[in-house]
Amino acid sequence: MVRESDLVLTMFLCAAVLATGLVLDAGQRRRFMNWFCLAVGLFYFCSGLLAIVVNLLDIYIYLPPEGVLFGLEVPESLHYLNVFNTNRTISSLWFYITLCMMVYQFFACKRRALRIPIVIAGLLFYLAIGMCFSRTVKIVTAGSVAMLAVLLAFRYLSFKRLWQKCLVVLICAALLIPLSFKSFDWLSSLMSQVSEVLISQVYGEQGDESVSGVDLTDSRDLKEDISNLSERGQIYASFIPTLKTDPKRILIGSFADKLMTVPNTFIVFPIPFTHMHNFLLEVFMLTGLPGFLLVAAFCLLLVLRMLHLFFTKDPRIGLAEKTLTIPLAGILLYGMFEVVIFTACGDRRAPTDMRELSFFIIAGIVLGYSHDILPKLPGLKRK
């Protein structure tokens, strides 16, 4: 799946962008994020708009100069967006990250008139997530909606007791996660009707009355896939047998092209898997226990800083800064079911991609803000 040289280059790139948020002051971070959101938002707005249009028209195109497939992809009877010839989980996470950036920019923007295009872009990214048909990212997005609701409740409502805050968190999770997840089904049904109207107008003028719209509904059995984690359970279960069969992986890991040779012998599936579908297990397989401990320590520190920033009452931290914890939480959750960070997750055209770089850019910003108001975490202070 990856090349060893890509892993090394990726870590240097990620370390560089992580340091960006740590070396800048608060004002510089804000300006940096404004330009970052603008660049990412414009690129993926154009990409998403083009992909949605060609999808609704049931067509596809090849983009120069490489002739990259762009538009409609129909595996397993699912019509989903194909953006730059990537799979649906990669494309949908792109749009998820840009959606989170629009949420941040909405609260960071002081000019109300500029919030209108931000909202339009955010709605398009939300729609694109639904049309990519990645249930992992749909669940992540639904959880992010609940996190945003919790932030808004803590900001505009007064809760003096801990049990009240816990109750708000539970209510937001219980109501908004299933409702947000269901909203993607409603969007798919709506877009199916829009597709039928568009196609009938385009082809009706040519005298072809037999055409119909694209069926964008998801017919997969959600309960069955949840019960077996879409076959991920077998992959996770192969971890310990793999280490017993090839114990040297515990200390030195394995070469990238040999990563799944042993695990696949314990998996019953028609197609061999190419990765562990969990970034922590993937890191362990690639680097062994030493690399795993380093990554686990970084993730633990990051999560603690995220929680601190999310719940802080420090007046120097506004709602916009707190929303930056949402995409980090979403990408970490996504990484429990896919590979996205620390693993050179880009395709053969590049050693990494926007998902991994964005994670470390945002992580650096969050660590910087948290360090400004609390240089040392309480549990890490020296006695």
Predicted feature locations:
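Juxtamembrane membrane-water interface segments that cap and precede transmembrane helices
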Residues: 68-85, 268-282
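Transmembrane alpha-helices of multi-pass inner-membrane enzymes
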Residues: 145-146, 324-383
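Hydrophobic transmembrane alpha-helices and their immediate junctions
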Residues: 42, 153-154, 286-332, 373
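Interfacial transmembrane-helix termini
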Residues: 1-13, 22-32, 48-64, 82, ...
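Long extracytoplasmic/lumenal interhelical loops at the membrane interface
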Residues: 223-287
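A membrane-periplasm/extracellular boundary helix in multi-pass inner-membrane enzymes
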Residues: 152-223, 241-245
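Alpha-helical transmembrane segments of multi-pass inner-membrane proteins
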Residues: 31-67, 85-155, 328-329
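Hydrophobic, aromatic-rich transmembrane alpha-helices
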Residues: 95-110, 146, 290-313, 363
